[in-house]
């Protein structure tokens, strides 16, 4: 009986390639077949890279044939968010502004995954320049949620989440500025991890908010995400990124340790927040009960300044975005308006026609917030709020080891259902504060919601650079929900896509 590629985790694929059960080339071909069979329904990719994938697979197979030791993720198919440079592909940020831009170097995070043996299957769709929570702002096409193709996959890393949920790849990379890994992971029913700020190099990743952005992995299981973190951090500090920290540890070492006696924080106000749906609330309450059943102590904690997080984020984020996107001027590279009489017209018209509505909105807001007379009033206040929120978390972590909360206030919504940008911003209600303070957070699937029968998740957050401990708690939660969706790799692929193409 043929083995379905999407029934295997990244760990199982790497083990199978190392053991000779199948070749890396066979895995690459299976992933490409799955993409061909499923992509029409999910539209997770902006560019598929069969040549790069097969070349990488051939190198893995040649090394094995020569008796060389294989890297830990040898033969594992990987999707890469399209704001990360990879030589041999375009890096468009899902924007007309960079529609034809060819990567001239490879991002450190991508290179480290390739060095670990991953096969680059292509570039995943996203919200334009990572501005959004639904992947609807992509200039090229929408990405559909594999659990219901009339609903959004979340964003901005929607393509990365959907590619894993549809079983097209085993791992993917995303970036998280305000929840852009954890929220789509929640809506698509996969594991999504935002490490501590500085844990993963951002060199070669097109910047949105430089003090907020962090790269992280998506996978079907917590173990797969831990293996990806080993690859992303194993080489230590990246000299090309001044924020990069040397935090190389084996993220799998204590993954299955008991959490008995550990303390899990619960924020009562978060569970009563406006917009939190009953099915998500019930799922998170079940998660708390499961952790308690495994011996953890539930402790109420207070984060009194958290209600300022969204306001602070939408000052700091747009201000940094305005600065970062000023380089896209239509002169040096990117979209260039034709027929302009002078450089001023070329720059202004190229930006007017190259950027989409949300990208313009964020930059206009940033320009206003950085203007004379406004900067002192709002930007300083936002930075003060940032300090207070960080202090709140530090005080909480003096009492608990991790904090449990929702990852998203609701399950996946239908395309066009949320048209008001300010309402869309509330999709990141539970995730933004982690980018404000820089701590790690992970979205863990809890099965399907009672009302919508769509994926629901819980989020676990932890102190800075305690990411290995955070993964241990995530694995404990995953064990507790193994009979629903989480922990059963074959079931973590959306049923409408499972088994379509991709036989090994």
Predicted regions and their residues:
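Immediate post-signal peptide segment of exported/extracytoplasmic ligand-binding proteins
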Residues: 60-76, 255-267
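Serine-dependent amide/ester hydrolase catalytic core
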Residues: 14-18, 272, 305-306, 327-436, ...
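Long amphipathic alpha-helix in the N-terminal Rossmann-like dinucleotide-binding domain
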Residues: 51-61, 117-118, 127
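Residue-level signal for inorganic ion chemistry
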Residues: 31, 53, 106, 225, ...
């Amino acid at each position: 009986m043929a083995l379905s590629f999407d029934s295997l985790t990244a760990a199982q694929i790497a083990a199978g390639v190392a053991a000779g059960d199948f070749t890396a080339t066979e895995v690459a071909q299976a992933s490409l077949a799955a993409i061909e069979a499923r992509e029409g329904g999910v539209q997770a990719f902006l560019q598929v890279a069969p040549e790069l994938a097969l070349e990488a697979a051939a190198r893995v197979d040649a090394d094995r044939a020569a008796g060389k030791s294989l890297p830990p993720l040898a033969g594992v198919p990987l999707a890469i968010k399209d704001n990360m440079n990879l030589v041999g592909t375009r890096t468009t940020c899902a924007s007309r502004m960079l529609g034809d831009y060819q990567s001239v170097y490879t991002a450190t995070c991508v290179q480290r995954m390739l060095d670990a043996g991953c096969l680059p299957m292509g570039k995943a769709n996203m919200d334009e320049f990572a501005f959004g929570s639904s992947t609807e702002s992509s200039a090229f096409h929408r990405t559909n949620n594999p659990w219901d193709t009339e609903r959004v996959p979340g964003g901005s890393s929607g393509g990365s989440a959907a590619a894993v949920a549809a079983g097209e790849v085993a791992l993917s990379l995303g970036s998280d500025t305000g929840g852009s890994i954890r929220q789509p992971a929640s809506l698509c029913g996969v594991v999504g991890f935002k490490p501590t700020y500085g844990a993963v190099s951002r060199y070669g990743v097109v910047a949105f908010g430089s003090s907020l952005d962090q790269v992280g992995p998506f996978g079907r299981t917590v173990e797969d995400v831990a293996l990806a973190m080993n690859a992303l951090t194993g080489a230590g500090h990246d000299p090309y990124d001044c924020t990069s920290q040397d935090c190389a540890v084996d993220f799998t070492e204590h993954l299955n340790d008991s959490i008995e006696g550990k303390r899990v924080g619960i924020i009562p106000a978060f569970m009563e927040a406006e917009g939190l749906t009953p099915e998500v609330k019930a799922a998170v309450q079940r998660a708390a009960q499961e952790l308690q059943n495994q011996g953890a102590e539930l402790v109420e904690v207070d984060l009194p300044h958290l209600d300022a997080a969204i306001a602070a984020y939408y000052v700091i984020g747009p201000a940094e975005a305005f600065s970062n996107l000023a380089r896209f001027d239509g002169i040096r590279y990117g979209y260039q308006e034709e027929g302009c009489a002078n450089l001023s017209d070329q720059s202004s018209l190229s930006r007017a026609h190259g950027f989409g509505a949300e990208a313009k909105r964020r930059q206009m807001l940033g320009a206003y917030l950085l203007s004379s007379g406004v900067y002192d009033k709002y930007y300083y206040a936002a930075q003060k709020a940032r300090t207070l929120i960080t202090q709140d978390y530090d005080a909480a972590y003096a009492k608990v080891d991790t904090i449990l909360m929702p990852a998203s206030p609701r399950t996946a919504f239908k395309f066009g259902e949320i048209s008001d940008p300010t309402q869309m911003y509330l999709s990141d209600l539970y995730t933004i504060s982690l980018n404000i303070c820089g701590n790690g957070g992970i979205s863990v699937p809890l099965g399907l919601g009672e009302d919508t029968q769509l994926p629901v998740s819980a989020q676990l957050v932890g102190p800075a650079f305690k990411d290995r401990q955070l993964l241990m708690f995530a694995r404990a939660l995953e064990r507790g929900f193994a009979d629903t969706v989480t922990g059963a790799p074959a079931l973590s692929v959306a049923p409408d896509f499972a088994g379509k193409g991709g036989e090994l």
